[in-house]
Amino acid sequence: MLKIYLAGPDVFEPDAIEQGERLKALCEQYGFTGLFPLDNEINQEGTPYEVAKRIREANVALIHECDIVLANLNPFRGLEPDSGTVYEVGYATALNKKVYAYAKDHRPMIKRIVESQSLSPSATHCQDNKVIENFGLPLNLMMLDILISVGFEEALRQLKVELNDV
């Protein structure tokens, strides 16, 4: 069975362990083995920095172990995805892993920024006077071509079809 690393801010949900179990169960239904970051047993002793470093190293080890990364790129604490998840996507890409993602909102980012900041529809800069990337994409251009669906299960269905066609 192919192993899928389940990247995303799901680890911050109040029921994160149960959420991870649900995601892994869905992976099994589609013939995959899900690897959830909270599967790692982390020694909680030491400074916050030391614990954080162990968490990072354990998650990186799961990325090395997996065949595919499936990332939840839904907005997290703002309009953009979780920065840790984005790091994991980049890391997996550098390892030549297959990387796919899902997010509910596929509207171009410029439209979402204009709407959330009540800007003119013709705005080219956000409230912080930074240029708003306008390639018609829902995420930064570095995420080009990895966004395959609006939800987790739909992404698994698409992966199953795509991998069976190979």
Go through the PLM ranges and name each one.
Residues 1-166:
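Conserved catalytic or regulatory cores that recognize and/or transform ribose-phosphate-containing ligands
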